[in-house]
């Protein structure tokens, strides 16, 4: 009887809380001189690092908020490489948009915005579901945080044959492809040449994502696949990292890069700098120097390209097709349109396109929005990015950390890498699931089931 009463009281509390939240939006409209003033219509485009941070920190009482994104979850991208090899499960690094905050405080539409009309204060929206007609939505304020796309540099065959690593479905495809390569290589009738191709894994791009995926892949092989596929010749497994420039991890200090390279070479990873890709075919990649490298899996991680919505917009853009914003993140010439993250650049600043910048700028903008009606005679301070450091996992329980004050490497760098990302996860659920996955992998190994 006591438990039943407790459940009923809990339901009543939740119902009252949700009703109050919605009533606050509907009834506690701001009043000035006896007139009811409707909340401004605020549309947020995207649900990446910027948009997610902005939504979490925004005071929803002042706005009628609508989030529009074809992806219905926030993705913790720094750990995407871990999910691609089974160290973490996919759901552990994804946070549904609808659970970001009280669902009565905003609307979510699973759709893509195909065009923006800033003169008419409207966006054209197309549902992600088939055969849905586009529709127009009006806004008083617009926040653009659609992120970026994969950059193929126009190289022939990349779109058709390479695997990207930017979304959850990319990680799922890569994990399945790795397992498929080992299963096919273990067939009794496979030729030596075909087996060597299947066991060659090529990663294009020596930035943080390329380095971390290479590290995770090598861990997957040395800790799990080599044990579970005993008849696959160890000496035939090749991991090749291609970097067009002369240096991997170009944003890190050279001494940390050297430590990463030593770790890679000790693991048998083939790092090739000054190696530009000319063309990607179904079974091999052609380099500028004419070399042909056969592969079973090729992962493309070579920087970012701009979102079509941004590229085709009428906003003023920089040489990298990013929307130019002022130091208050307002789009040039439009005081009611704002942008942050990979798709925007503060004029004359050239901040790096990282999750750090996107998150900090979004929190800044949310505070600006929250303070708009406060009687503050002082103008708001401009946005200033605060560098918090660079992190990268380099395999074999080793990592590197670079800050303005100190550097770390080795096992302590690995612990710092994990700790830093654990604290940055978006929800309590993720903060419980991720360490649970780490412990499961440590005890039982990574899952190699195909599904």
Swiss-Prot record:
Annotated catalysed reactions: a ubiquinone + NADH + 5 H(+)(in) = a ubiquinol + NAD(+) + 4 H(+)(out)
Residues that coordinate or bind NAD(+): 199-236
Cofactor(s) needed: FAD
SUPFAM superfamilies: FAD/NAD(P)-binding domain
Protein's UniProt keywords contain Translocase: yes
Leading EC class: translocase
Protein EC: 7.1.1.2
Pfam families: NDH2_C, Pyr_redox_2
Residues given in the record as FAD binding sites: 41-71
Keywords from the named record: FAD, Flavoprotein, NAD, Oxidoreductase, Translocase
One GO location term (cellular component): mitochondrion
GO MF annotation: an example: oxidoreductase activity
Superkingdom classification of source: Eukaryota
Family, per entry: Belongs to the NADH dehydrogenase family.
Protein name per UniProt: Probable NADH dehydrogenase
């Amino acid at each position: 009887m006591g438990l039943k009463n407790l459940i009923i009281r809990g339901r009543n509390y939740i119902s009252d809380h949700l009703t109050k939240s919605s009533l606050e939006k509907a009834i506690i409209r701001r009043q000035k001189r006896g007139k009811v003033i409707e909340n401004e219509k605020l549309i947020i485009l995207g649900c990446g690092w910027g948009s997610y941070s902005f939504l979490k920190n925004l005071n929803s009482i002042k706005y009628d908020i609508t989030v529009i994104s074809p992806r219905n979850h926030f993705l913790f991208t720094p750990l995407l490489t871990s999910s691609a090899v089974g160290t973490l499960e996919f759901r552990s690094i994804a946070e549904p948009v609808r659970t970001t905050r009280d669902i009565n405080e905003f609307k979510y539409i699973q759709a893509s915005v195909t065009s923006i009309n800033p003169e008419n204060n409207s966006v054209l929206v197309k549902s992600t579901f088939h055969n849905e007609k586009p529709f127009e939505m009006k806004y008083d304020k617009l926040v653009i945080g659609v992120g970026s796309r994969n950059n193929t540099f126009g190289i022939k065959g990349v779109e058709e044959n390479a695997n990207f690593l930017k979304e959850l479905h990319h990680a799922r495809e890569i994990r399945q492809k790795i397992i498929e390569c080992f299963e096919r290589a273990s067939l009794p009738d496979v030729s030596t040449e075909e087996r060597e191709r299947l066991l060659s894994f090529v990663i294009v791009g020596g930035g943080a994502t390329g380095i971390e995926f290479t590290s995770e892949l090598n861990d997957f092989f040395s800790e799990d696949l080599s044990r579970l596929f005993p008849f696959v010749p160890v000496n035939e497994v090749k991991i090749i990292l291609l970097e067009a420039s002369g240096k991997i991890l170009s944003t890190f200090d050279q001494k940390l890069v050297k430590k990463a390279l030593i770790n890679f070479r000790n693991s048998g990873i083939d790092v090739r700098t000054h190696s530009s890709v000319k063309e990607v075919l179904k079974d091999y990649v052609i380099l500028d120097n004419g070399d042909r490298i056969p592969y079973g899996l090729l992962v493309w991680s070579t920087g970012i390209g701009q979102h079509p919505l941004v590229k085709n917009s009428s906003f003023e853009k920089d040489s990298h097709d990013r929307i130019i914003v002022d130091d208050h993140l307002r789009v040039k010439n439009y005081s009611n349109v704002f942008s942050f993250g990979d798709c925007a650049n503060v004029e004359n600043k050239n901040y790096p396109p990282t999750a750090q910048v996107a998150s900090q700028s979004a929190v800044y903008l949310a505070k600006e929005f929250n303070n708009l009606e406060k009687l503050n005679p002082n103008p708001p301070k401009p946005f200033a990015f605060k560098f918090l450091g660079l992190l990268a996992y380099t395999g074999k329980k080793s990592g590197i950390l670079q800050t303005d004050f100190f550097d770390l490497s080795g096992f302590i760098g690995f612990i710092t890498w994990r700790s830093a990302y654990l604290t940055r996860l978006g929800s309590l659920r993720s903060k419980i699931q991720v360490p649970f996955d780490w412990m499961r992998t440590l005890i039982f190994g990574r899952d190699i089931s195909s599904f």
